[in-house]
Amino acid sequence: MFVTGESGMAYHNPFIVNGKIRFPANTNLVRHVEKWAKVRGDKLAYRFLDFSTERDGVARDILWSDFSARNRAVGARLQQVTQPGDRVAILCPQNLDYLISFFGALYSGRIAVPLFDPAEPGHVGRLHAVLDDCAPSTILTTTDSAEGVRKFIRARSAKERPRVIAVDAVPTEVAATWQQPEANEETVAYLQYTSGSTRIPSGVQITHLNLPTNVVQVLNALEGQEGDRGVSWLPFFHDMGLITVLLASVLGHSFTFMTPAAFVRRPGRWIRELARKPGETGGTFSAAPNFAFEHAAVRGVPRDDEPPLDLSNVKGILNGSEPVSPASMRKFFEAFAPYGLKQTAVKPSYGLAEATLFVSTTPMDEVPTVIHVDRDELNNQRFVEVAADAPNAVAQVSAGKVGVSEWAVIVDADTASELPDGQIGEIWLHGNNLGTGYWGKEEESAQTFKNILKSRISESRAEGAPDDALWVRTGDYGTYFKDHLYIAGRIKDLVIIDGRNHYPQDLECTAQESTKALRVGYAAAFSVPANQLPQTVFDDSHAGLKFDPEDTSEQLVIVGERAAGTHKLDHQPIVDDIRAAIAVGHGVTVRDVLLVSAGTIPRTSSGKIGRRACRAAYLDGSLRSGVGSPTVFATSD
C-alpha cells in the first residue's frame, strides 16, 4: 500500500526497495487492474465528466469490477481477430470507451497506438501519417464515431484498411474467452507518437516494463497514497495525458477526467474538480501545460454566486510539456491562494515521450524555484546566477529533481563526455522507463536510444548506472545548478505556443502563401522566450506585447527573405499580411516578423532551413543587423 506513516514517518512506496524500483516478476498494468477488480471491485475506478449535453456536466462512472470486465471483453475480441505483434489504433473520442480501448489492447497482448477521433479538427494529416507508419490491423472506436472512422479510412486500399471495432458494442460475455497475454517486460505495450519537428511522426516503443516504471516514478514524486484522487483534462493521445490518467491503475483509487474542450471553454471545471469533495480525506493531483495555469487564473476563479472551494487538498499539479513561466505560476497562485491553494502545489517538471513521460519535478515540500542568470553567459552555454534586477537577467525555472531509478546527465554531445554542474549541454537519460526505440526506424533509434557515455566527472550524476549503460539523447539543452535540473532551451525545431504544437514548416508555408514578397522556401519559424525578445518588438504596437522580465512564455517569430524586386516595398503591409494569415490559420500571434535580404537565413549542409542557427542569430542581434554569416550559423544545427 502507498502510505504515509504516523508520527511523521516518511512517505512509503511499496515498489521502492532500498531506493530502487522493484516489481514482482512479469508485472504490468493488466495485473494491477485485475488486482483492484478483486479487492476493490465495488469502488469507483474512473469518472468521465461529460459536458456535451449539460453545462454542469454528467458524471459517467465505471467501477473496478466493471472496468476489468470490459477490458477483458475487448481484449478477448482482439485476441480472436488479431495476431501477436499487431498494432491496434485507438480512434475514440475522449471518454470511458477510450480507456477501455487502450486497456483492451494491453489485455490482448497487442500493441496499442493511442490516437484520436478523426473528427478532431486540425489533425487529419497527422493521423494519416501515423496510420501509414504503424500500419494497424485494427482500429478501436465507438458506435457513434464508427461511421466517421470508416469514412476516414475509405481512401486507403482494401489491403491496408484496418478492421474497425466499436468497443461499446462488444458484449461483456466475450470476456469469458480472454487469456492472460504472454507479454514479458521487453514486449512493446504501445507506441507513443511524438510531435516531432518533421511531418513524419515517430512512434516511441514503450514496453510493459517502461510503463509501470514511469507510473511509479510519477506516483513517488507526487507521494501518491491511499485515498488520493487524480483529475485531468489532457488529451489521452498526448504522453502527459495518458500517463496521468494511468496513475489510477497502480494507485487503485479513482480518477476524474473531462475533455480538453471542456477545460478550455470553462477552466473553472478543472479547478472545481481539484477541490475537496464532502467526506474526502485524501489529496488531489493533476498535470497541465503552462498556458493552462494562466487560463485558469483569468477565467477559472469562482463567481460570488458559486459554492465555495477548498483547494487545500491539492498535493501537486505537474507543470510540463512546454517552458514554464514564473508569471503564469504567480498569477495562478494569487488567484487561488484565497481558496487554500498551497504555494507548493504547482510542480514545474520535465519529461518527454522517449522517457514514457516523466523525468523530473519539483520536490513535494518545495515551492517552485526561479533564479535569474546572465543572458550573455547563457548564450555561451554557462549558467551564472545574477540579481533579478541585473541588466542581463533572464528568469529560469527549475525542473526539480530526477525521479527514482532514473538518471539524467548533462553531456557534451560531440565527445559523449559528462559536463560539470553549471555548464549547459545535452540532457541524456538512462532508466527502465526509457523506450526501446522508434517504430520501424532503426537508424534514428540507434542515434537516439543507443548512446554510450564515454567519460564521467568525479561526482557523476550517472552514479549507479552501469558503465556500459545505453543512454537516450533528448535533444534538449540543460544543466544542473544547486542540485536542481534546469532546461536551458529546446534543440528540437517544434514550436510550442500556449500548449499547442505547431510544425514550423506549416507556419513558414502560411507566411509565404500570404504574400508574394517572400522568397519561396526561404522562411524560418521558431519561438523565443518573451523576455528575450528585442526591445523593438515591445516598441511595436502591432506586436501586442508588454515587457515583463519574468515572462518566459514562448513567443512566435517569423524570419523571411525578401523576394527579388520587393526591397523598395513598404514592409508594414507585408508584416500585417503574414501576421493575419498565421493568426487565422494557426490561432497564434506572431510577435515579430523580420524581413531580411536574400542569402541571410542559414541553411544546413543538406539544404534545409537552419532554424536553430537562425534563432541564435536572432537572439544575439546579428540577424537583425545583417552582420552574421549563414555558413557559421548553420554549423550549430
Curated annotation (Swiss-Prot):
User: Any idea which positions bind ATP?
Assistant: T194, S195, G196, S197, T198, R199, S349, A353, D476, R490
User: Could you say how this protein's activity is regulated?
Assistant: Fatty acyl-AMP ligase activity and transferase activity onto Pks13 are both inhibited by phosphorylation. The acyl-AMP ligase activity is inhibited by the alkylphosphate ester of AMP, adenosine 50-dodecylphosphate (AMPC12). Also inhibited by eicosyl-AMP (AMPC20). Loading of the acyl-AMP onto Pks13 is inhibited by 5'-O-[N-(11-phenoxyundecanoyl)sulfamoyl]adenosine (PhU-AMS).
Please name one Pfam family that this protein belongs to: AMP-binding
**Protein name (database record):** Long-chain-fatty-acid--AMP ligase FadD32
- Which residues are annotated as modified residue Phosphothreonine in the UniProt record? T552
Q: Which reaction does it catalyse?
A: a long-chain fatty acid + holo-[ACP] + ATP = a long-chain fatty acyl-[ACP] + AMP + diphosphate; dodecanoate + holo-[ACP] + ATP = dodecanoyl-[ACP] + AMP + diphosphate; tetradecanoate + holo-[ACP] + ATP = tetradecanoyl-[ACP] + AMP + diphosphate; hexadecanoate + holo-[ACP] + ATP = hexadecanoyl-[ACP] + AMP + diphosphate
Keyword Transmembrane found: no
Q: What else is known?
A: Was identified as a drug target. Inhibited by a series of 4,6-diaryl-5,7-dimethyl coumarins that directly inhibit the acyl-acyl carrier protein synthetase activity of FadD32 and kill M.tuberculosis. They effectively block bacterial replication both in vitro and in animal models of tuberculosis. Quinoline-2-carboxamides have also potent anti-tubercular activity.
Its biological purpose is as follows: Involved in the biosynthesis of mycolic acids. Catalyzes the activation of long-chain fatty acids as acyl-adenylates (acyl-AMP), which are then transferred to the phosphopantetheine arm of the polyketide synthase Pks13 for further chain extension. Can use dodecanoate (C12), tetradecanoate (C14) and hexadecanoate (C16). In vitro, displays a preference for long-chain over medium and short-chain fatty acid substrates.
The listed outcome for F291L is: Confers resistance to the coumarin inhibitors
InterPro entries reported in the protein's UniProt record: AMP-bd_C_sf, AMP-dep_synth/lig_dom, ANL_N_sf, FAAL/FAAC, FAAL_FadD32
PANTHER family linked: DISCO-INTERACTING PROTEIN 2, DISCO-INTERACTING PROTEIN 2 DIP2 -RELATED
Impact noted for substituting T552V: Cannot be phosphorylated. No change in activity
- What species is given as this protein's source? Mycobacterium tuberculosis (strain ATCC 25618 / H37Rv)
One GO MF annotation is: ligase activity
